[in-house]
Amino acid sequence: VGITVKSGRSVFTYARIPIGTATQELQALAEREYEEVGQKDLDRLNVDWARYGELDAAGKLATFIAKRDGMIVGYAAFIVQTHIHYQDALVAANSAVYAVPEVRAGRVVLKLLRFAEMGLKAQGVQKIYYHVKQTKDFGRLLGHLGYEDVERMYAKVVRDREVG
């Protein structure tokens, strides 16, 4: 189930999908995302599609896509589960969000995130969390959608790199 929107000469479709139905297309986009903002201090990109599939089968994954003229041009994936500190609250934590540069100037990302929010809310999610990379900060867009900047995330690689 999705919605279709005509924008100029293009037709955009926003939908929620089982992740297993589009892993090849999503892999290609994940590689583009990795080139732009990936954590190069870790090993190469190696998406665990099997684990995503397990989460999806367990009802703990929500994957939303934007298509332009039948091709996926953006995605937003969320891990959905009860909050470990508030077990009565179903929450969604954004696992990944990406749109190809060619569609970012329009409202594709805005519409994708709104569609995802509607879908998550319909599922019973009470709170949605996004993590935002400093190198591709879309916090202004999230603020426009009513989200608040509530905490920061810090990271450090603690294992030595293997030389070889």
PLM regions with names:
Residues 2-46:
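Short amphipathic alpha-helix that is part of the acyltransferase structural core
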Residues 40-63, 67-68, 76-87:
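A conserved beta-strand-loop-helix scaffold within acyl/acetyltransferase catalytic domains
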Residues 61, 122-125:
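Short, high-confidence coil segments that cap the C-terminus of an alpha-helix
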Residues 95-106:
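A short, internal acetyl-CoA/4′-phosphopantetheine-binding micro-motif in the GNAT/acyltransferase core
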Residues 104-118:
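Conserved acetyl-CoA-binding loop-helix of GNAT-fold acetyltransferases
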Residues 128-139:
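Conserved beta-strand-loop-alpha-helix junction that forms the acyl-donor binding cleft
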Residues 143-164:
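C-terminal "cap" of GNAT-fold acetyltransferases
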